[in-house]
Every structure is written in C-alpha cells, then in structure tokens.
Amino acid sequence: MAAMARRSQPRQSSPRRQSSITCALAALSLVAVIPAQDPTVQESLNPFFQPSSLPFFAPEFDRIRDEHFLPAFEKGMADHLAEIRKIADVKEPATFENTIEAMERSGALLTRVSKVFFNLTESTTNAKLQAIQAEVAPKLARHSDTIQLDPALFARIEAVHAARDDLPPEAKRLAERYHTNFVRSGARLGGDAKQRLRAINEELSTKTTEFQEHLLADTNASAVHVDDVASLAGLDDAGISAAAGAARSAGLDGGYLLTLQLPSSQGILSQLDVRETRRKVYEAATNRCCRGNGDDTRELVRSIAKLRAERAALLGYATHADYVLADQMAGTPSAVREMLTSMASAIVDKARSEAVQLREFFERQYPGQQLQPWDWTWAAEQVRKEKYDLDEAEVRPYFELDRVIEDGMFFVANQLYGVTMKRRDDLPTYHEDVRVYEVLDADGSSVGLFYTDYYARPSKRGGAWMDSFVDQTSLLGTKPVVVNVMNIQKPAPGQPTLVSFDEVTTLFHEFGHGVHGLFSQARYPMLGGTNVPRDYVEFPSQFHEDFAFDPAVLARCAIHHETGEPIPDALLAKIQAARNFGQGFASLEYVAAALLDMAWHTLDASAEVGDVLAFEKQALEDAKVLHPLIPPRYRTPYFAHIWSSGYSAGYYAYMWSEALAADAFAMVMERGGMTAENGARYRAQILSRGDIIEPMDQFRTFQGRALDTEALMKRRGLK
C-alpha cells in the first residue's frame, strides 16, 4: 500500500516519511459513531469509497466534504485489517508474493482517505477537521500496533527475510525494510512490554496532534496589530497592503496585522525601521506557546520527550536519538554531534565577526543604545546595503511569483530533465489558490501531476513542505501526484505577488522535493520517491536550491514586474557577491536548533526535566552555541519539526544532506552545469531510485567517489 509521506528544514520544509505499512496500518481500529444509514447509499455518496475517476487518480476535491472522512477511515481500516488478517492466516509457507508484496497491495481505501485528510489538516484545516484528527490520531496508533505487533504476521515476515538472498535486489531490499520496521516497532517484545508500547504510541499520537493545534492557534493569536501605518516604516507597499488585508481577514476594525512565520527570526524584521515594532514582533514570535495561556506547550513537550525516551528503552535503545538514528545514514547520536560541533567553532567565530560589524553600524544609528536580538536582521540588511550596495527593496520587484515559477523553476526542470509543465485548470482543488500542472516528459508521455499552494492563510500551518496525494508504484500502476506548499503573503487583489530572494530559493528547495517524488521509478510503494532516510531526503531539495543562483535562470525569471526589464547585470553580481553574507547568523541559529533537538532526545527514560526553558538554555550553553543575540531557529515550545512533524532527533538532517548537495552541485558545475546530460544522470541515479538502493551507494555512484565536505564549508561561506 502506498506510503504517506510528510515532510519540512532550515526553510521549514520537507516530506514526512513513514513506512507504507505504518501509513496503511495507522488507522484500523477507528470505530466512529455515525448516524445509522443504508451502507449502500453511504458508499455511493462517499468519494473515497471508490478509486478516483479523475486522471492520475487525483483527489475529487469537488466531491469531498468533511463528513466523508470518518466513514472512509472506518471502512478503510476495516477493509485493510481484513486484508492483513488474510495474509497472516495463509496456510501455505510464507513467500515474498503472498506476504510482503500482498501487504504492499493492501489498504487502498485507507491510503486514499489518509493522503487527502492529512494534507488538508496542514494546508486548510478547520474546527471539524481538527476534531476528526483528535479522534483519529490515537486510533491510528492503535491500528498500527495491531498490525506490527501481530506475532503470526511477523513470523511470516521473518520467514521471508530469512530467505531474502534468493530474491531479486528490489524485492530483497523491501523484505529487509519490512523486517527492520517490524522489529523497530516492537514485534519481538513480550506481552507486557507490547501493551505498554501500545499505550505509549497512542498517547504520543494524541499529544503530537495537540501540539500542532496549539502552535497554530498561538501563532495566529500572537500576530502583532498596529494602528498607525507609520509603525510600519520601511515595509514596502506590498507588505503594507498584505498587513492591511490580514487585519481585515482577522475581523479587526482597521489597522495592520503582522502575522508570524514559524521560525524565531521573522523575515519582516529586516524591513521594519521602527525599533518598537521590531521588538513587538520579535517578542511575539519567541514567546509563542510559553505565555502561560491555554496554548502553552511546555508541559506537552516535556511529556512527549519522556514518552519517547521510555519507548526507546522498551525497544532496547539508550535514548530516543539512538533509536531514530539507528535507521538513518548518521547511525548514532555521537556521529551527529561530531558533525555539528566540528562546524560550530567556525560558525560561532563567523557570528561574532558579524556581531562586531553590526554593532558598529547600530551604534552610529542609535548612539548610546545596545544592539538587541530584534535589531539583528534589520541592521544586517542595512550593512548589506552599505557593503554590497544591495537593497532587498530593489531586488524584490524583479521576482514576481508566477514568473519565478514558470520561467525559473520550470525552466530548470526542462533544461535538466526535459520535462514541461502544462496547466490543468480542469482538475478540482481544495482551495482557490491551488494550481495543478501535468508534468510531461520529453517524449510527451505523462510523468504525473504537480500541485502548488503557495499563499499563507490562518488555516495553514507555518513553513514550507512537499507532500503527495498519490505515490508512484509500478506494482499498483499509479503515477505520482505531489504538492508543494509555502506561506507567501498574498497581495491585495490586482497586485502582483513579489517575493524575496529567500522565498525564491525556498521555491526551488521544495521543487527539489517535488521532482524526487515525480521521477520515482520504484515497483514498491515503500521504496519509492521521498521514502528515504531523513538525512538523505533533503539532498535533492538543497541540490535544487543552488540553481536559483544560476545566471541563466536569473536572466529568464528576474524581470521587473512593471517595466519588463531584465534584472541588471550589476544587480545580479551584487546578489551573487552577497550570497554568503549573514551566514554566521543563519548557520548558528540552525546548529543551535539541531543541537537543542539532540539534547532533548538524548535524555534517557529516567531523566526529569523541570523548567523547559531552563533546560533549553543549559543545553545551548553546554554545546557552546548560546548567543545573546541569536536564538535557535526554533525554541523548544514552538519547535514543530521535532514535536509534530517527524524530525525528532532528525533536525541535523538538513546539514547532513547539505553536505551531499553541495558536493554534488559542485561536481555538476565542473561538468558543464545545467545540461541535459547532468540532469539525466541525476534523475537516473538519484531522483528515480528512492530507497531501492542504499542512499550512500546512490551518492557514490553519481559522484564517482566518496563524500567531500569541502564544498559544504564553501557553500556556507565558512572557508
């Protein structure tokens, strides 16, 4: 059955990775209380009860209603359990076909409803969907355990695993993944331990869902409202218009509403000239979910960390990080810490150097006052203007969203991979802002569908990510249907969407995840697309980021939205020259967050954390990354990646993957850059492979050698 991937990174991104069995299994014991109704009528009206009639089995959003989800979960899980029971009860000896492959075929209805539901709860949630999610989440956990802790089923998987050397390579890989997943899910535990594991998993599913809801609520509630436009001095016209629109959407009587993004440092701070407004925005962002209100998450995260540690101990691991990393490229917490701390010294030194530079500038502007955290990015933007004669306000008019997509991202896809993107306005979407493209290969054949959902709204969680509605699998005969999601401020009606260059690189980043899913050539759902280790999944995304800086790309997509003039060569040169400006700040906030993640998840089951924020401060001090002016990219109470988005003990993965991306991109540049030959090799040896082949073996095949981290240091301006 197809895997349900979830993802987000330093750019708040990424595909969520779950095994296909976990996805399909994750819902079975849901017994919803619904009105008595003729089941035949109910099935005929519920669009999930049959495969979609649309091309590529795309979701029938014009038919889907909130009330369809619970019945579809109920029937989907019942059907799936019956399929699994049939597999476990087969009288004949276990074979790959009657056990592993049969499990991959199972759970079609459950997959359909899960894919749509969990995409909607992140992109356009509402009170009804949140109530369904709260009800479904613990039942999904129980369902997963029902399957993965079944001794008869595991005995058959073990039998296939024992004979795996006789299987073809891809089937052997799949048998190994199933066996590993079941063992890591507790299949070998005794009765009492299994019961405790079930309880932990159910409680964790509830608490992580609660965290997500509290974070969304407090992020919306913490938005900063100002009455006077003078308080927004420095903000461009598009930003002011968006703030006015946000206030209207929130039902406020006039004024301007500055909504918050997911990280600690808000992008808008670099533009706001009024220091008091900067302070309000910064404090609103960094105090989220720790204000002592109903959305305070401190007790919740402490409980989540404790439960994860207990589960790891049950499964034979010292800590949750040991458990997670045993199935990743890094392997161990010590390997992660070694990688992060080996760079920390150079990063801290660069941040100190930047601080000296910014203080000198700031003291000229504010004599007798001290630089504060809310001043950093504003001062950095002013220094960048001075040093490189580069003003973000000068750059933004050249980056209109549609042109960046059509003539930037899609141009790269065409040059590298030979594909073209065709608008499909005939297909329904879940929101008016969503667009659909059919991806056509060089020979005119269809690759799949690509959905885009780029505008922010209160019902969408923060950040940027890729997900899928349908996964590629030759076993089931399905082509990929993927979606890229961001949180770009929507302009006033009739106004163009102008994006920052950071948003441009995020667009390319998420598109890298998109093509990873689109170009998958796997037979089995579990091994396809982005179903790879966390510290590998960010490799294609960060590899594609670098094409945003390619002069040939910028020459096409950086066109002034009013004059139609291409961006001047002199301005392009400034963008390239300033690329690594501020890397001390960016690298330190990231490494601090990654080490904070490791601090929480290397606690053993006996550890007791009292004050959450005191623990955070001590962890950063111990790691020598505590900086008075640079908070971690995410503080503990709003660190969604590790508490609700599948990156627990995994936030390091962005830098681990970045090392692969930097090395691969450098090699591509040495071999001619954005050429069809380079693209064909990357598509064939990386993007199409999923988890069919060990990730590091994929990388070595593409590079022709082992990883060299020199390119990473250069990419971050640390060497």
Label each PLM-derived region with a short phrase.
Residues M1-R17:
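N-terminal secretory signal peptides that target proteins for export/translocation
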Residues V41-R65, K75, G234, G255-L257, ...:
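C-terminal, non-catalytic "cap/extension" segments appended to globular domains
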Residues S53-H68, V116-V136, I157-A199, T259-E299, ...:
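Short His/Asp/Glu-rich catalytic/ion-coordination signatures at enzyme active sites or charged loops
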Residues K86-K91, T95, H320, R423-D426, ...:
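Surface-exposed patches in mature extracellular/periplasmic domains of secreted proteins
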Residues Q489-F508:
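Short pre-active-site segment immediately N-terminal to the catalytic Zn-binding motif
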